[in-house]
Amino acid sequence: MKRFIIAPLLCLTAISALAWGQKGHDVTAAIAEKHLTPATKAAVDSILEGQSMVYWANWLDNASHTPQYAYTKTWHYKNIDEGVRYEEAPANPAGDVTTAIKAQIETLSDPKAPFADRQLAMKIIVHIVGDMHQPLHMGHATDLGGNRNKVRFFGRDANLHSVWDSNIVEAGHKWSYSEWRDQIDRVSPEEAQAIVDGSVDDWAKQSAAIAANIYRQTPDGTNHSYDEVATWTPVIETQLLYAGHRLAHLLNMIYDPAYAASFGK
């Protein structure tokens, strides 16, 4: 599985929040569940009251459109405009995907935080770690993360963001989310270690670099057909795999002292 070793892979004002579509988020959560340590799994089960991470994987996409959780709308993405370095991207005062991930980690790490706050943080982080790995959720504010980029998918009108959310996922493999998990999550322990190295910001930079490459290779009017599906499906496989392993890693670092100690924490 050498294609999954971390390397420079090909290296949004209101933006569509549906990163990966339902299946992609389910895949991320399913992979993460597979890599929770027993201590972490017990903690997650307690916080989610016996429901799975997959059960909650897509909850935030709907919740963000309700008055109660409208404040989370900007937490699904981070805007990195063309020619702007990740470190120089202006901060969104309402928050973005990276600041939101860090905030949920802080809440989940606080044993004194109210249970309801920790449960909400779990539901949120299960989703937005996946969002961060959808490259166009690190896209340009000027085109709403590809939502304004008009392309075609097998001859039908589409936008670049929707193509990456679900069209290529569905065209690449006719698998259920559990089949996706079983087929792409076949890395060695050494490869798994490489995947989780780095920080949330390091991982976000990787997604932003992929987004920049997508923009370069996909001018407006591009018709995505078999060649494009063949080109981009391995990238999607990698991003979903990384998202699942990294989500598990973040939770293991919080809930399993022995795991954290193995990383010098």
Where are these regions (language model features)?
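Short, linear, compositionally biased motifs with a strong N-terminal bias
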Residues: 10-11
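Positively charged n-region of N-terminal signal peptides that target proteins for export
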Residues: 1-4
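N-terminal, motif-rich segments that launch catalysis or mediate targeting to/interaction with membranes
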Residues: 18-128, 135-265
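N-terminal signal peptide c-region/cleavage motif recognized by signal peptidases
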Residues: 14-16
